[in-house]
């Protein structure tokens, strides 16, 4: 009994010593794991490490797949890494593309030599990189937007309407001389792509008709506006001047001359842009000079406005009248287009039928009173011309109130009634005012005078009468009687528009007094109030 505790005690002490030994080993192992006594430069420690590239290749999913370009043998000649990277780097491809923009195409012999050498090089070793000059024309990186491949020239000329290149199959034509109003027969617009060669006679004629004399910028506009008129190959354009320019009155394109910009009009060239009187009319010399620099495609058929030619219409009429027209260069309206001549200085009031630039038109005519022919625009026939014809009828384009500086009777009555215009002429403004009182005479008001117009200057009175769009009347105290619904005793100064003053309208809603002598024609401006009178009095038209 006494030995048992000793035995047990010795056994326990053995266990304790064994456990303490194991604890020391664990402590020493933990200290070895976290505290390295071997420096990093130790070769044994470095030999146990794996390279980072190998770790990345092992951890990547597709790293075990090797592309065939890495399995090719390296070339024997030393190659710089820039040349190795020139084919694959996007920056290198971009620099290569930018460097080749605008360069001319290499010669075909050089191209064949380059392609042959590159093909043989690919047969020998596929790992040799391509240099900048070795890339063929089919490579996308060497795309040149300003150059055309020799095989694709005909196709691109028929596909694109804006970029036309003169092809050898259809040489550029000189514009054919003919009548300006000759009808055209364009091909149907259902053909989107026409042939690029002009072989038939019809296509040759269409080439001659539709080839404009300027650069390729107007090719697209003309094709869009005329529904692809003419074939695509026939539109061979040339920026060089035409070798034989025609006369100024023969065709529309030759009037403009070589190198000038042709007017692109939405109208067909056979039609007139603005309406003109018939060809039997006579034109003054200055109008003919103004229209001489404009293409006759905008004029009526058979009308020629060249005063220098005796065979033209104007020249024949001027010679019969005994007048010599001015040259085109000395005309004050030379170079102006007909729409601007028609509308630049005209009054925009529909009831004002006078023309304000008459002095410019008539300044160069030696016998201008003979140039005027009666061509009524608004009223074809009225009783006044038959009963008492005026001494001098109006201008052909603007017959009412046409004044000339050397005219002995410069003042014209512009009164228009239901029977037609009056058109009577007077030598002084007083006579004109006295005549106008007969048109606008109210009963019992014939003794009043007109204080608004200055009686000293006859030209100023006539010009004011024209710009007021009304004949000056002696019946009303103010000059703007037809425009204003009331009468002012103070004349022109009180007829202005005052925004803060009450308008002295007739009390009780009385109707506007209608002149008895005017008949069925009365100016509608009497109902408009004072705003129109202010605008016209200040000169705003």
Curated annotation (Swiss-Prot):
Biased composition (Low complexity): 236-255
Any one Gene Ontology cellular component term annotated for this protein: nucleus
Residues in C2H2-type zinc fingers: 411-439
GO biological process: embryonic camera-type eye morphogenesis; hindbrain development
Location(s), subcellular: Nucleus
Coiled coil: none
Location of region: Disordered: 1-49, 97-255, 474-511
Feature: compositional bias, Polar residues: 1-18
PROSITE patterns: ZINC_FINGER_C2H2_2
InterPro entries: Elbow/Noc_ZnFinger (IPR051520), Tscrpt_rep_NocA-like (IPR022129), Znf_C2H2_type (IPR013087)
Protein family according to the UniProt entry: Belongs to the Elbow/Noc family.
Function: May function as a transcriptional repressor.
Protein's name in the database: Zinc finger protein 503
């Amino acid at each position: 009994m006494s030995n048992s505790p000793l035995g047990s005690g010795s056994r326990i002490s053995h266990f304790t010593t064994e456990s303490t030994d194991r604890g020391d080993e664990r402590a020493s192992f933990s200290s070895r794991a976290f505290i390295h006594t071997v420096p990093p430069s130790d070769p044994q420690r470095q030999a146990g490490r794996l390279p980072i590239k190998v770790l990345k290749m092992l951890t990547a999913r597709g790293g075990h797949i090797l592309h065939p370009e890495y399995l090719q043998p390296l070339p024997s000649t030393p190659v710089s890494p820039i040349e190795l990277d020139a084919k694959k780097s996007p920056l290198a491809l971009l620099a290569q593309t930018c460097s080749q923009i605008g360069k001319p195409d290499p010669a075909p012999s050089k191209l064949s030599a380059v392609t042959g050498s590159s093909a043989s090089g690919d047969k020998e070793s596929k790992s040799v990189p391509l240099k900048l000059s070795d890339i063929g024309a089919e490579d996308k990186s060497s795309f040149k937007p300003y150059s055309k491949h020799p095989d694709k020239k005909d196709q691109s000329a028929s596909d694109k309407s804006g970029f036309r290149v003169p092809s050898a199959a259809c040489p550029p034509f000189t514009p054919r001389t003919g009548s300006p109003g000759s009808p055209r027969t364009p091909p149907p617009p259902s053909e989107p792509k026409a042939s690029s060669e002009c072989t038939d006679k019809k296509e040759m004629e269409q080439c001659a008709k539709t080839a404009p004399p300027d650069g390729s910028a107007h090719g697209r506009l003309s094709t869009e506006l005329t529904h692809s008129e003419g074939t695509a190959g026939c539109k061979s354009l040339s920026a060089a001047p035409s070798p034989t320019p025609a006369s100024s009155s023969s065709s529309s394109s030759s009037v403009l001359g070589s190198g000038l910009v042709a007017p692109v009009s939405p109208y067909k060239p056979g039609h007139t842009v603005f309406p003109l009187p018939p060809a039997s009319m006579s034109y003054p010399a200055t109008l003919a000079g103004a229209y001489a620099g404009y293409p006759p495609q905008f004029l009526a058929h058979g009308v020629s406005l060249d005063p220098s030619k005796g065979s033209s219409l104007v020249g024949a009429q001027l010679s019969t009248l005994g007048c010599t027209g001015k040259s085109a260069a000395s005309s004050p309206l030379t170079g102006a287009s007909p729409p601007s001549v028609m509308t630049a200085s005209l009054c925009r009031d529909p009831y004002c039928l006078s023309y304000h630039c008459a002095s410019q038109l008539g300044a160069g005519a030696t016998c201008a009173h003979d140039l005027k022919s009666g061509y009524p625009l608004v009223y074809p026939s009225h009783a006044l011309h038959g009963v008492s014809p005026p001494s001098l009828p109006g201008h052909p384009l603007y017959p009412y109130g046409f004044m000339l500086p050397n005219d002995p009777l410069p003042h014209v009555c512009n009164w228009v009634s239901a029977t037609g215009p009056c058109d009577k002429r007077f030598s002084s403004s007083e006579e004109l005012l006295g005549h106008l009182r007969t048109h606008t005479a109210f009963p019992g008001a014939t003794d009043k005078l007109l204080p608004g117009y200055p009686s000293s200057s006859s030209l100023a009175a006539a010009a004011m009468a024209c710009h007021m769009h009304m004949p000056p009347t002696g019946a009303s105290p103010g000059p703007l009687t037809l425009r204003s619904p009331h009468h002012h005793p103070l004349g022109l100064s009180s007829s202005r528009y005052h925004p803060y003053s009450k308008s002295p309208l007739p009390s009780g809603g009385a109707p506007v007094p209608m002149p008895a002598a005017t008949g069925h024609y009365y100016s509608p401006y009497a109902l408009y109030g004072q705003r129109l009178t202010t605008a016209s009095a200040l000169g705003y038209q």
